[in-house]
Swiss-Prot record:
Encoding gene per record: serC
Function: Catalyzes the reversible conversion of 3-phosphohydroxypyruvate to phosphoserine and of 3-hydroxy-2-oxo-4-phosphonooxybutanoate to phosphohydroxythreonine.
Identification of the protein by name: Phosphoserine aminotransferase
Origin species: Pasteurella multocida (strain Pm70)
Annotated localization: Cytoplasm
Residues modified as N6-(pyridoxal phosphate)lysine: 196
Length: 360
């Protein structure tokens, strides 16, 4: 069977080594003659897995001791509601820096729970570019400042941290979590849906500073209350054990490759190769300014809808799957998360060259 590369924005490609291990252990996990999906989440073996997964994640990201790690459900959309329910306190208001669809959606949901100010930081001229990031002069009036450092639809990534003074910085890292080095101590809370870089859909990571826990409004549902979830080790209800197990395997896999430093180098190399090709030809166009081009989601177009549709169809037939751009933007999108090997990017570029030669 010929090799297939999955460029889906999510659920996304998983590391082949992780899938192979999961396949090998599927019917007999930890010599129990049963699947990890069938064991008690409160049993000794799964509790050990949960504990080790947290230790491995702490090692990967150098997470300080005064941060709690939660493995929750409901996706990033669930956190759009959970964050204001837990973090809106005395000031009763938050600032949302919007740069695309997902940050704007988060702001819209947060308005159900408090006073939300929104500032659009995306400049839309000939190229998409992030504008002002210094909000230190106004941030103190807010309980927290929220932003999304990588917008999957447009392929816009923010590499510099917003300046927010002493305010709490909250980041939706669903699409670039574990893709590059970050200083966790600069954030009050980080959250991410798993289905791009962490594991399969169905589990959500929250990394939250301890002093931000314990302030949820009284009407906060139990499953969204960080204090209750933290005290219950993310097991106030039965967690998605198989998804958690796969995340644990991904963490081990990333450590075996050399950790975040090595992963970042690989991601830089993959993205640079693809962007260099896009720069070399007028046949395709990327709409994002160089300084904000995403390493995870590379968008491009021929500026011809019929030609774009033909590209996607022929690419799929060639084993390059899920390259259709989001309906909001159109064109094509290659999502090249951690699990995408350099071989996949090279195969895509080879196809793009062939398609250009046949259709220019």
């Amino acid at each position: 069977m010929s090799k297939v590369f999955n460029f889906s924005a999510g659920p996304a490609m998983m590391p082949e080594a992780v899938l192979a291990q999961a396949q090998a252990e599927l019917l007999n996990w930890q010599e129990q003659q049963t699947s990890v999906m069938e064991v008690s989440h409160r049993g000794k073996l799964f509790m050990a897995l949960a504990s080790q997964s947290e230790l491995d994640l702490r090692q990967l990201y150098q997470i300080p001791d005064n941060y709690r790690i939660l493995f929750l459900q409901g996706g990033a959309r669930g956190q759009f509601a959970a964050i204001p329910m837990n973090l809106l306190k005395e000031k009763g208001k938050a600032l949302y820096l919007t740069s695309g669809h997902w940050s704007a959606t988060a702001a819209k949901e947060a308005r159900l729970f408090g006073d939300i100010d929104e500032v659009n930081i995306l400049e839309e001229g000939n190229e998409l570019k992030i504008g002002q990031l210094d909000f230190s002069h106004i941030a103190d009036q807010y309980d927290y400042v929220h932003y999304c450092p990588n917008e999957t639809i447009s392929g816009v990534e923010i590499f510099d941290l917003p300046k927010v003074g002493n305010a709490v910085l909250v980041a939706d890292m669903s699409s670039n979590i574990l893709s590059r080095k970050i200083d966790i101590s600069q954030f009050g809370l980080i959250y991410a849906g798993a289905q791009k870089n962490l594991g399969p859909a169905g589990i959500t990571l929250v990394i939250v500073r301890e002093d931000l826990i314990g302030h949820a409004r009284q009407t906060t549902p139990t499953i969204w209350n960080y204090e209750i979830q933290s005290k219950a080790d993310s097991m106030i209800n039965t967690p998605p054990t198989f998804a958690w197990y796969l995340c644990a395997l991904v963490f081990k896999h990333l450590l075996s490759l050399g950790g975040i430093e090595e992963i970042e180098k690989r991601n830089q190399a993959k993205a640079q190769l693809l962007y260099d090709y896009l720069e070399s030809t007028p046949f395709y166009r990327n709409p994002v300014a160089k300084v904000n081009r995403s390493r995870m989601n590379v968008t491009f177009t021929t500026d011809n809808d019929e030609l774009n549709a033909k590209f996607v169809a022929e690419a799929t037939a060639a084993g390059l799957h899920a390259l259709k751009g989001h309906k909001v933007l159109g064109g094509m999108r290659a999502s090249i998360y951690n699990a995408m090997p350099m071989e996949g990017v090279q195969a895509l570029i080879a196809f793009m060259k062939q398609f250009e030669a046949e259709n220019r």
